[in-house]
C-alpha cells in the first residue's frame, strides 16, 4: 500500500512536472510570438519612417536644384532688365542730343535767315 501510494505520488509529480514543463514551453512560445509581433510592428514603423525620410531627402534635393535654377534665371532676368533700362536711358540721351542739335540748327537757320534777309534789303534799296 505504501509502495502504491509512493508510485501514485511519483506518477502525479511526474504528470505535474510534465504539465508544468508544457505550460513553460507554451509560455516561452507565446512570449517569443509576442516579441516577434512587437518587433515586426516596430519594424514596420521604422521602415515607413525610413521610406518617408528617403522621400523627404529626394524632395529636398529636387527643391534645392529648382531653387538654384530659379535663382540663376532670376539673375538673368535682372541682367536683361538692367540692360533694357540702360538701352532706354541711351535712347533718352540720344533723343535729348537730337533735340539739342535740332535747337542749335534752328538757331543757326534763323541766324542765316536774318543774315540772308539783311543782305537782300540793302541791295534792293
Curated annotation (Swiss-Prot):
Superkingdom in the source lineage: Eukaryota
Disordered: annotated segments: 1-24
Keyword annotations: Coiled coil, Cytoplasm, Lysosome, Membrane, Mitochondrion, Transferase
Subcellular locations according to the entry: Mitochondrion intermembrane space; Mitochondrion matrix; Cytoplasm, Cytosol; Lysosome membrane
MF terms in GO: protein-lysine-acetyltransferase activity
S-S bridge residues: none
Pfam families for the chain: GCN5L1
Record bears the keyword Membrane: yes
Enzyme class (EC, first level): transferase
GO terms (BP aspect): aerobic respiration; anterograde axonal transport; anterograde synaptic vesicle transport; lysosome localization; neuron projection development; peptidyl-lysine acetylation
One GO CC term on file: mitochondrial intermembrane space
EC number: 2.3.1.-
Catalyzed reaction equations: L-lysyl-[protein] + acetyl-CoA = N(6)-acetyl-L-lysyl-[protein] + CoA + H(+)
Described purpose of this protein according to its UniProt entry: Component of the BLOC-1 complex, a complex that is required for normal biogenesis of lysosome-related organelles (LRO), such as platelet dense granules and melanosomes. May also play a role in intracellular vesicle trafficking. As part of a BORC-like complex may play a role in lysosomes movement and localization at the cell periphery. Associated with the cytosolic face of lysosomes, this complex may couple lysosomes to microtubule plus-end-directed kinesin motor.
Protein name: Biogenesis of lysosome-related organelles complex 1 subunit 1
Species of origin: Xenopus tropicalis (Western clawed frog)
Amino acid at each position: 500500500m505504501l509502495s502504491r501510494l509512493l508510485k501514485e505520488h511519483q506518477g502525479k509529480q511526474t504528470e505535474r512536472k510534465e504539465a508544468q514543463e508544457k505550460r513553460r514551453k507554451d509560455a516561452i512560445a507565446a512570449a517569443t510570438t509576442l516579441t516577434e509581433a512587437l518587433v515586426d510592428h516596430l519594424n514596420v514603423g521604422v521602415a515607413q519612417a525610413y521610406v518617408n525620410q528617403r522621400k523627404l531627402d529626394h524632395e529636398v534635393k529636387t527643391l534645392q536644384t529648382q531653387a538654384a535654377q530659379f535663382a540663376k534665371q532670376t539673375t538673368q532676368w535682372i541682367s536683361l532688365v538692367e540692360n533694357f533700362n540702360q538701352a532706354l536711358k541711351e535712347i533718352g540721351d540720344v533723343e535729348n542730343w537730337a533735340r539739342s542739335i535740332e535747337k542749335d540748327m534752328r538757331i543757326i537757320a534763323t541766324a542765316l535767315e536774318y543774315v540772308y534777309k539783311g543782305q537782300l534789303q540793302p541791295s534792293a534799296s
